[in-house]
């Protein structure tokens, strides 16, 4: 996102921040390896080096203030007066934001938030948590909504075994449920289809597969992954989730 500004409710404090997606290799490292590396590291530079090896920029890795799930908060500023006094509030806001993102109150993953600058009131009483947490969330929300966020959905990677003569019918069942075929092979008289299917579409799949393959087809789970929901389903799904949660029945905007 471009650099955006968040203002405190009392108008005495301003934060300049930006939001961008984390590279897939870094995100995967944060998900699968970061906690173990941090737990076993004798020195902090070992964690830094592991992040750089995963693909993070040197300067970003040097200035991480917080890692939360698969998201990072980076201090990209050049010396902000009184930053230490408000840092705890900024990081609390960051974690709350990541736990309930602005699209539909769902968790956010793969996010890098950068703090570029801050203008803070001289008197500490005017830059407490009730001022700085909303300010931080305001800036992050503006940046997030300008960074082309997408709703992602869980999918299951499956192995489908079917007699070769009913393979086409099995593939039809997969495609009818927004599934994608990854690979096909033959093992003796059987065909093996490796595919991925949205979890939402799996209800009734086993019965449908049995019906399409004369009772001989079956599937097994390989892995669970997350991928962006198709563009044409994004808005309606977001609105449906917002309705279920009692949120405003409209897409989030910068003006909120």
Report each predicted region and the residues it spans.
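Accessory interaction regions appended to the cores of large information-processing enzymes
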Residues: 1-256
